[in-house]
Amino acid sequence: MSYDIAKIRADFPILSREVNNKPLVYLDNGASAQKPQAVIDAVTRGYAEEYANVHRGLHFLSNLATEKYEGVRAKIARFLNAPSEDDIIINSGTTEGINMVAYGWAMPRMEAGDEIVLSIMEHHANIVPWHFLRERQGVVIKWVDVDANGDLDPQKVIDAIGPKTKLVAVTHMSNVLGTVVDVKAITAGAHSKGVPVLVDGSQSAVHLPVDVADLGCDFYAITGHKLYGPSGSGAIYVNKARMAEMRPFMGG
């Protein structure tokens, strides 16, 4: 398949600028993607023509904003092949999504000595929340190393699961190496031991077709700004069983 690179670049206004008298070349999409004109236009239109509180009013603009908001939830559910729109929690990104799981699901059911299994290739968004839980409740983090090629062996993750393990939390694709992790195999092995699985899908959702129904994971977190969407946007898929166990981690 061939791509018209000039046409693709033309979709991104920022790529028309120059840096040091040369056309801008941006190679940091792994951290955050630039925004195409369609996204910029949609955000501008939202503030200029459609803005109001979501789920907080009965007037025209509030109903319109709510309809748009719920439309996004439906699109995310289809994008991830979630069984239901009710499985999608919209948030500010993967970091908030993982914190939702840490404080709204893990903290109420974990005590000192309980274990969380992580790989050493995790992004800080999938490390720091668990360190906070370790400091607050004395949970134990078990680390699984990668091989010489930077690959994560699913069996090593499964073997790390013990009788006190309460959660496995792994990335689907490394933000540093680009390594793709077989989270379907990890999920199957973890579930055979009665342990839920959280997947950090920040990178994989951009590059791979994601089917949470096929993967079987309990949680799958994504970030909008890496998917060419606005900053401060994201979502987490939570399966029906885990959703019933979730508690709000913020109030107001």
Name each model feature, range by range:
Residues 1-252:
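Pyridoxal 5′-phosphate
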